[in-house]
């Protein structure tokens, strides 16, 4: 898997000198899956909290290309609606261990054959295997 970023502290991305805190400064809007093109776009928008820097990107997309695996584990039945868009953690994890969906590894870059797993505060988990992840950023 080729990626354009490093994962920092399992909740943020480092990209071209920018620290992008997906847990605190961005809300997950949803994902678009184009099965024919084997592409998944994970969509994020800047949080409205007063702690978010004014010069933070307005939104971003993590575009997964040549997807060969997708697993979505639904959120908890008693999830808090406010938490549904909040990323808990993000991790690369070996695709050989797909039965394990509740652990993370503190690695900044993927190893050969890794999946990427997005853990949300709501209990939802999205696991993807692809050839490339591109980070697309938008400014106001």
Go through each PLM region and give its residues.
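Surface-exposed, interaction-prone regions used to assemble/regulate multi-protein complexes
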Residues: 1-140
């Amino acid at each position: 898997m080729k990626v354009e970023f490093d994962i920092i502290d399992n909740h943020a991305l480092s990209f071209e000198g920018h620290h992008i805190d997906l847990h605190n400064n961005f809300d997950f809007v949803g994902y678009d899956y184009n099965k024919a093109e084997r592409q998944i776009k994970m969509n994020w928008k800047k949080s409205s909290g007063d702690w978010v820097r004014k010069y933070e990107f307005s939104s971003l997309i993590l575009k997964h290309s040549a997807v060969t695996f997708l697993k979505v584990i639904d959120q908890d039945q008693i999830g808090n609606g406010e938490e549904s868009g909040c990323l808990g953690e993000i991790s690369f994890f070996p695709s050989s261990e797909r039965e394990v969906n509740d652990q993370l590894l503190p690695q900044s870059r993927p190893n050969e054959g890794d999946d990427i797993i997005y853990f949300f505060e709501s209990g939802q988990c999205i696991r993807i295997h692809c050839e490339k992840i591109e980070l697309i950023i938008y400014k106001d």
